[in-house]
Design a protein with these regions (language model features):
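IMPase-like, lithium-sensitive Mg2+-dependent phosphomonoesterase catalytic core
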Residues: 2-53, 60-62, 73-339
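Alpha-helical scaffold segments that form or flank carboxylate-/histidine-based iron centers
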Residues: 66-69
């Protein structure tokens, strides 16, 4: 009987990757599978969020008799739970937690990875049914194994990432992750309850026709950014356009679209957020890693995102990220300013 080997599940893919590296311990594969499990559980709740909200408003108790939790707190608990009870993660940092957590048990203290994540980015979009996502970033700890992790294990430059990825809860639910060997996308197949390889070896097109920015802040942006945006608005067929502006206010969705189709996403400095809005460690770094492995570029307007050495867990950064050719055109405007 022929076994269908055409479509690999996430588990099969990570095991195949591990087999390609005889010295691999399997810890990273286990960690990615743990994150996939958390994503499946979050997906169930996200898909019925509207219903739960209505029931939750009625009396704070949902149909299962559970206390209605905020969905992003729920998502945080799911990701933290699978990593804490797994065998591959020594500690975590999360958008939902003030400080990092060292799991500090004998198994976890001997794990070689730490993970940072935004458990449910864009959760403000849930009540209007806009796609949202989970973002994660994996590093090898820098302190010796056998002891609890410390802050320096988390404050590493993004270039040290071992893996990074996201889950987008959209028209379908997809998990996309990158290692230095490539970027691969897996679509959740409800018929078997598994993420199945649907987008092997994702490459970000060198040029695209989509620019993503919040036009509501236009007059707060520095002049080179304004100048570049106006160039985008004036592109013609002859100059690589015409461009279209797409911005749905959910980073995972905007960046997933631009990764697949080509495009540029910008979150520049504004008056009330002079250092940018997006978080370096668990929003900018993971996407910068993914986009660079896929052939794109990511900077804060001055330096490569992955080269920034963080000083705080929740520090913010400006972000310009996307297709290599579009980023280089933007950089030609920014360099004039810097010059
Ligand atoms: P603004 C969502 O709140 C988020 O963190 C990202 O997902 C999104 O790209 C950005 O903020 C949108 O911010 O200020 O344009 O609404």
């Amino acid at each position: 009987m022929m076994v269908n080997r055409k479509i690999l599940t996430l588990d099969e893919f990570t095991i195949q990757q591990m087999r390609a590296f005889p010295h691999a311990t399997g810890e990273l594969s286990n960690l990615l599978r743990d994150l996939g499990l958390a994503a499946k559980r979050i997906n169930v709740e996200v898909n019925k969020a509207g219903l739960v909200d209505i029931l939750g408003d009625a009396g704070e108790i949902n149909v299962q008799g559970e206390d209605v939790k905020k969905l992003d707190v729920y998502a945080n608990n799911q990701v933290m739970g699978v990593l804490k009870h797994g065998i591959s993660c020594a500690g975590i940092g999360s958008e939902e937690l003030d400080d990092f957590i060292a799991f500090d048990d004998p198994v976890s203290n001997n794990s070689k990875y730490v993970c940072m994540f935004d458990p449910l980015d864009g959760s403000g979009n849930i009540d209007v049914n806009v796609s949202i996502g989970t973002i994660f970033s994996v590093y090898r700890r820098v302190t010796p194994k056998g002891q609890p992790v410390s802050r320096e294990d988390f404050l590493q430059a993004g270039i040290n990432q071992v893996a990074a990825g996201y889950i987008v809860y959209g028209s379908s639910t997809m998990l996309v992750y990158a290692t230095r060997r490539g970027v691969n996308g897996f679509t959740l197949d409800p018929s078997i309850g598994e993420f199945s390889l649907s987008h092997p070896n994702i490459q970000c097109p060198e040029f695209g026709k989509i620019y993503s920015v919040n036009h509501g802040n236009f007059f707060q942006y520095e002049k080179p950014v304004q100048d570049y945006i106006q160039v985008c608005q004036q592109k013609t067929k002859e100059t690589g356009g015409p461009y279209t502006q797409r911005y749905i206010g959910s980073m995972v969705s905007d960046l997933h679209r631009n990764l697949i189709k080509g495009g540029i996403f910008m979150y520049p400095a504004t008056k009330d957020k002079p250092k940018g809005k997006l978080r370096l460690l668990y929003e900018c770094n993971p996407f910068a890693f993914i986009v660079e492995v896929a052939g794109g570029k990511a900077t804060n307007g001055k330096v490569r995102i992955l080269d920034i050495v963080p000083t705080e867990l929740h520090q913010r950064s400006t972000l310009f990220i996307g297709s290599k050719g579009m980023m280089e055109e933007l950089e030609s405007f920014l360099q004039r300013e810097n010059a």
